[in-house]
């Protein structure tokens, strides 16, 4: 288990961070990320799995899993909800007998959890999210991945209405997604495929160091017991209960295309994405669908996410945005060509790209964004 309590106390005294990760290592030869997710889903409906593979099908160094979040942040049409799960402690018998007025929480017994909810109306959820991120900001630790806990979830396409309110975007259709759903995971299970280790990670909060360190050590032991002896959930496969149909019929969609072409001709826009979601009633779980994706379409960004009311599974080749060491990067595929095998082929691909109006429009759109 590392770092030591003395090292954590030293880092806490510096005052740079309010949360410091602590880690316990296990050998990974008895586990797989898929098997681990079966255990975590049995313990909590709120969980995730993040994995990565490059184009040559070489798997990334880490697979990340999390469960049982301490907070969930959701927002729909400006109504922001923050649900917190706080741990409960009880005085030990000796403290009661001596008549102490206050409980020393470092010596208190952990007896359970309680939930609370805060609801507010906001013009932009980003302000509340930034405050929470700042409260739980953690240092990068030796022998740990850069992600050691934090927010995991999704922002829907409708989230744009908070950044561009003047567009007055309204949706007549009832959407399946909230504007955002983010969960705060203090515990992380990371598979280090390079070192063949499973890293169990939780956080020590510096505002009550003794109590928090003791509880973190207990939590790591609870995680160890869970993954070694926990029950596994059987995920029922997806079974369609109705035909898959587009949200817009062909005639309506063609009408939308013609209207978009008119706006482009008038100069109001130069590109538009006209989505047409496919819908069907189904039973079962998306987790087996995720397993098929990771086997048939290994990608740099593969994800499975589950909450009380939704499951999401996907595999994406693109880096939308990446923040590392204070540097923000984006690597979209639109408006690009693959590299050639020779300098001559590179030149030919470059010339073809520069003459492709569609690719140029996509490139300009991304630069504009």
Spell out what each predicted region is.
Residues 1-100, 104-106, 111-369:
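Extended alpha-helical targeting/anchoring segments
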């Amino acid at each position: 288990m590392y770092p030591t309590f003395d090292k954590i106390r030293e880092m806490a005294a510096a005052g740079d961070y309010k949360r410091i990760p602590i880690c316990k290592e296990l050998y990974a030869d008895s586990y797989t990320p898929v098997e681990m997710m079966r255990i975590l889903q049995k313990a909590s409906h709120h969980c995730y799995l993040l994995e990565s593979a490059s184009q040559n099908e070489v798997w990334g160094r880490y697979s990340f899993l999390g469960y049982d979040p301490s907070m969930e942040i959701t927002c729909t049409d400006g109504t922001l909800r923050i649900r917190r799960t706080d741990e409960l402690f009880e005085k030990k018998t000796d403290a009661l007998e001596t008549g102490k007025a206050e409980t020393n929480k470092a010596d208190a017994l952990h007896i359970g959890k309680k939930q609370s909810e805060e609801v507010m109306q906001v013009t932009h959820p980003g302000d509340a999210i930034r405050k929470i991120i700042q409260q739980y900001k953690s240092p990068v630790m030796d022998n740990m991945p850069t992600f050691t806990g934090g927010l995991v979830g999704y922002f829907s396409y409708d989230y744009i209405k908070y950044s561009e309110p003047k567009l007055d975007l309204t949706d007549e259709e009832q959407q399946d997604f909230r504007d955002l759903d983010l969960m705060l995971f203090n515990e992380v299970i990371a598979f280090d495929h390079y070192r063949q280790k499973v890293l169990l990670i939780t956080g020590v909060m510096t505002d009550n160091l003794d109590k928090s360190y003791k509880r973190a050590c207990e939590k790591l032991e609870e995680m160890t017991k869970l993954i070694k002896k926990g029950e596994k959930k059987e995920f029922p496969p997806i079974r369609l209960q109705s035909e898959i149909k587009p949200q817009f019929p062909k005639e309506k969609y063609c009408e939308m295309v013609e209207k978009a072409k008119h706006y482009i001709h008038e100069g109001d826009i130069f590109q538009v994405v006209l989505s047409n979601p496919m819908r069907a009633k189904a039973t079962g779980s998306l987790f087996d669908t995720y397993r098929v994706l990771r086997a048939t379409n290994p990608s740099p960004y593969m994800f499975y996410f589950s909450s009380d009311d939704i499951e999401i599974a996907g595999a994406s080749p693109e880096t939308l945005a990446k923040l590392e060491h204070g540097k923000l990067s984006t690597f979209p595929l639109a408006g690009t060509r693959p590299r050639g095998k020779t300098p001559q082929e590179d030149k030919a691909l470059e010339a073809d790209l520069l003459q492709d109006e569609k690719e140029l429009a996509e490139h300009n759109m991304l630069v504009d964004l």
